[in-house]
Each structure stands twice: as C-alpha cells, then as structure tokens.
UniProtKB/Swiss-Prot annotation:
Enzyme Commission code: 2.7.7.38
UniProt name for this protein: 3-deoxy-manno-octulosonate cytidylyltransferase
Gene encoding the protein: kdsB
Record bears the keyword 4Fe-4S: no
Reactions the enzyme catalyzes: 3-deoxy-alpha-D-manno-oct-2-ulosonate + CTP = CMP-3-deoxy-beta-D-manno-octulosonate + diphosphate
NCBIfam families: kdsB, PRK05450.1-1, PRK05450.1-5
Native species: Parvibaculum lavamentivorans (strain DS-1 / DSM 13023 / NCIMB 13966)
The entry's keywords: Cytoplasm, Lipopolysaccharide biosynthesis, Nucleotidyltransferase, Transferase
Keyword Transferase among record annotations: yes
Broadest EC class assigned to this enzyme: transferase
Family of the protein in this entry: Belongs to the KdsB family.
Single annotated GO MF: 3-deoxy-manno-octulosonate cytidylyltransferase activity
Subcellular location: Cytoplasm
GO CC terms, sorted: cytosol
Principal location: cytoplasm
Length: 258
C-alpha cells in the first residue's frame, strides 16, 4: 500500500486542515462510513483520497467511536464529536476546535465522508479557489450534461456567471431549475473550503429563511453577506447514499486496483 503519512512538503498558505465529518446514522444506508469497499471501510477510502490531495493535515470528525477506531487502525487521525450536532459543518467546527485550539490552521477544507472515489485534485481546487482575494468560502460545481438533472430537485444548482473562466462568485444555490433561459446549468458539489473565521461565524448564525425554505445550508452564508467562490470542475464525484451507489463505488475502486 502507498505511504499515506502526512505530507512533509512545505505547508501551503493558511496551513490547510482537511476535516471529514462522518456519522453512522443514514436514512437510506445506515452505517455507511464502515461499509466495505474493496476490503476497506468507506471512511478510510475517503481519508486516503484526502491524504492523496497533499494539501495538509487530515482529520476525520467522527460521531461514533467505531468510525474513529477504523480510521486510527488505518493510520489516520480521528477525533470524536458530539453525535447530536445538527450538521456536518458543526461537526467540522467542533473537530477544528478540538485538534487546533491555538488557531494554527486558518484554512479549513470540509470533505464529505461519503465520497470514496473522489478525485483528490478537487480538494486542491477548492483550496485554490478559497485563497483568492475576498473569498470567505469556496466550493465546486460542474456543468450539467444529463437533461433529467436540470429539473431534479435533488440536484442542487449553483447560480454563478463563469463567462470564459473557471472561477465565479456564487449568486445563489437552489433546487429549482435556475437560471431561466438558454445556457448551461451547474451541479453544485458539496465540498467546501472555509477561512477559519468564516466557519466560526457561519456555525454561530441561526438557520436563515432561504436555508430553511430550500433546505440548503450554504444559503445561510449568502444571506449573511459572505462571499462564496465557486470553481468549475469537469465531473461530479459519486456520493454514496444508497446500496446502488455503494455497488458503483465498489466497482469503480476495483477497476482502479487492477
């Protein structure tokens, strides 16, 4: 197996800290962090992808001891968090405060714990978008190429004006088909970068009206006047939410190991 020790290279600006929130509770796939993918728990597969990104320290924010144990057994770093926290962002922030109370890490990257086939380059892309002047938060989006996704409310759209570039400021996020008219639509990818102070402010804010209406946490930041930089990438990573998704992830990683 490849050496996945923490990178020894010179630290990037902001001393990035990658945090992977994970909990056992899942409506459609209970216990999914420990689901076996090619002989390895899914959360360990995600941890490996984050390590392969090479942006800095990686910590799993575990809601349960079983998750933390699996990560530590694989050689990773994990911290236990309150299982009753309301969101992944709150879990990330609690982990940040636990592992870095002195504030050494001023850039935080939030990688979902159900992305075992994630291209590590996407983590670096989120970092690069965040360190642009004026950005409080960064995230990713990809052009929608499947017609059904344009009207699917489970496919969240990032509304931004990319023009000829690959970076744009987020104007809105919605489950609706937006913007109206001819032109591309963008599938939002829930991988985030935060300035540390922006994450602290975000989790301290109450849920906002549009956040509650759309059931999209990132709208809280927009309603509070925070700037979200969106980087356009080529593909949407596979999120494992169902048994069918799990089989797709197993097949994809099995092909990689051949």
């Amino acid at each position: 197996m490849a050496n996945l020790a923490q990178p020894a290279a010179k630290e990037l600006a902001g001393h990035p800290l990658v945090v992977i929130p994970a909990r056992m509770a899942s409506t459609r796939l209970p216990g999914k962090p420990l689901a076996d993918i090619c002989g390895t728990p899914m959360i360990v597969q995600v941890w490996r992808r984050a390590m392969e990104a090479g942006v800095g320290r990686v910590v799993v924010a575990a809601a349960e001891k079983e998750i933390a144990d699996a990560v530590r057994e694989a050689g990773g770093e994990a911290v236990l968090t309150d299982p009753d926290l309301p969101s992944g962002s709150d879990r990330v922030w609690q982990a940040v405060c636990e592992v870095d109370p002195e504030g050494h890490h001023t850039v935080i990257l939030n990688v979902q714990g159900d992305l075992p086939t994630l291209d590590p380059a996407l983590i670096r892309t989120a970092y690069e978008a965040l360190v642009r002047p004026g950005a409080d938060i960064s995230t990713l989006a990809a052009t929608i190429t499947v017609e059904e996704e344009r009207t699917n409310p489970n496919v969240v759209k990032a509304v931004a004006s990319f023009g000829e570039g690959r970076l744009a400021r987020a104007l809105y996020f919605t489950r609706a088909t937006a913007p109206w008219g001819e032109g591309p639509l963008y599938h939002h990818i829930g991988l985030y970068g935060y300035r540390r102070e922006a994450l602290a402010r975000f989790v301290a804010l109450p849920p906002s009206p549009l956040e509650v209406r759309e059931k999209l946490e990132q709208l809280r930041a927009l309603e509070a006047g925070m700037a979200i930089e969106v980087a356009l990438v080529d593909t949407v990573p596979l999120g494992v939410d169902t048994p069918a998704d799990l089989e797709k992830a197993r097949a994809a990683l099995a092909r990689r190991s051949v």
